Amino acid sequence: MKLLITDDEYATRSAIKHLIDPEKISFDEIFEAENYEEAIKVIINHRPQIIVTDIVMPVHNGITLIDWILQFSKDSQVIAVSGHDNFSFIKSTLRRGVVDYLLKPLDIDELNGALQKAVSRYEQRMEYYKLKKAGEVSE
C-alpha cells in the first residue's frame, strides 16, 4: 500500500508521517508532495492508493487536487486535512467523496482511524472489481 502526503508545510507532512501508528497500519512507500503539481507527478508515476491532502495550498488548492484525483485516479482514497472549520466548506469537500475531513492540529487517533478507513475502502473496491471480473457481481 502506498501513501501520498500533500501539504505545502514540511512540518505538517513530517507530523503526519510520524503520527501513523505502525501497529494499526503500515505503508510500503510514503511519498510527499509540497503542492498540486508535485502531487500530480507522484500520482501518475507511483499510483498511491491513499492520499492525504491539505486543502489550503498556494496556486492550486486541495479541492482542485481532489477533483483531479476523482477524474484520473478514481480508485485512490483521499483524506482532506485543513484548518478550515466552516461547515459548508467541510460539507462541500465531503460531498466530493473523500474518506474523511480532519481538522488541524491533527489528532493521532482521528488520523489513524481515517487511514484505516481509507485502506478498508480501497480493499473493498479492489475486491468488488475482482468479483465483477469473475462475473460474481453485476453492475
Where on the chain are the PLM-derived regions?
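Interdomain helical linkers/hinges and coiled-coil/dimerization scaffolds
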Residues: 94, 100, 106-139
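Acidic, metal-coordinating helix/loop segments flanking the phosphotransfer/catalytic sites
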Residues: 32-50
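Two-component/phosphorelay signaling modules centered on CheY-like receiver
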Residues: 10-31
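Receiver (REC) domain active-site loop signature in two-component systems and cognate sites
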Residues: 57
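Short amphipathic alpha-helix used as the core "switch/output" element in two-component signaling
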Residues: 41, 63-74
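Acidic catalytic/metal-coordinating carboxylates
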Residues: 35, 61-64, 82
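Active-site residues of response regulator receiver
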Residues: 7, 54
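Alpha4 helix (beta4-alpha4-beta5 surface) of REC/receiver domains from two-component response regulators
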Residues: 64, 85-100
